[in-house]
């Protein structure tokens, strides 16, 4: 959605690049694990017909896409066959083999590798600091190892640790 891309890469400076994804009405996330029924999918697809308000492209992120019901997949398939020009669908899943072949054949696939313990720790530290929280380095490394390469898991474990231990007491000994 960058308004001024350089060599195919986002500029990082325009209004679209600086948009807070969590507050954009043109970027919609659906958790398919809790919204797996056909009626929920149809409601989302009806909204896809409308042009984006602020961005060039409306983005629909369907998380845990492998959890969609058969009828929800069929509804999605019709739209994937002839998607509106102003819409991009991102199907995120940890189980691509569980998606129907008819859906997969209409998707461009990107596989993401697990992050290193160092990258997990650094990214989690950045997120925690932006939220005003701190965890000792040893505890953070313990959390990163437990996350097994998954950023979402690392943030979830860190959140649980902060809830259990409290900000100042998040030490490796308490976590173990």
Each predicted region: which residue ranges?
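P-loop/Walker A NTP-binding region and its immediately flanking N-terminal helices
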Residues: 1-109
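Extended, largely alpha-helical regulatory/partner-binding modules appended to the mid-to-C-terminal parts
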Residues: 15, 19-25, 56, 92, ...
């Amino acid at each position: 959605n960058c308004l001024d891309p350089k060599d195919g890469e986002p500029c990082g400076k325009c209004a679209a690049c600086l948009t807070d994804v969590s507050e954009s009405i043109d970027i919609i996330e659906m958790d398919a694990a809790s919204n797996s029924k056909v009626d929920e999918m149809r409601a989302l697809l009806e909204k896809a017909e409308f042009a984006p308000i602020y961005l060039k492209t409306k983005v629909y992120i369907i998380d845990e896409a492998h959890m969609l019901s058969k009828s929800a997949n069929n509804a999605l398939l019709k739209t994937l066959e002839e998607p509106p020009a102003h819409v991009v669908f991102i199907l995120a899943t940890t189980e691509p083999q569980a998606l129907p072949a008819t859906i997969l054949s209409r998707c461009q696939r990107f596989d993401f590798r697990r992050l290193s313990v160092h990258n997990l720790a650094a990214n989690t530290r950045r997120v925690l600091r932006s939220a005003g929280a701190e965890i000792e380095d040893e505890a953070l490394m313990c959390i990163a190892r437990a996350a097994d390469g998954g950023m979402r898991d690392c943030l979830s474990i860190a959140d649980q640790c902060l809830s259990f231990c409290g900000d100042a007491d998040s030490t490796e000994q308490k976590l173990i």
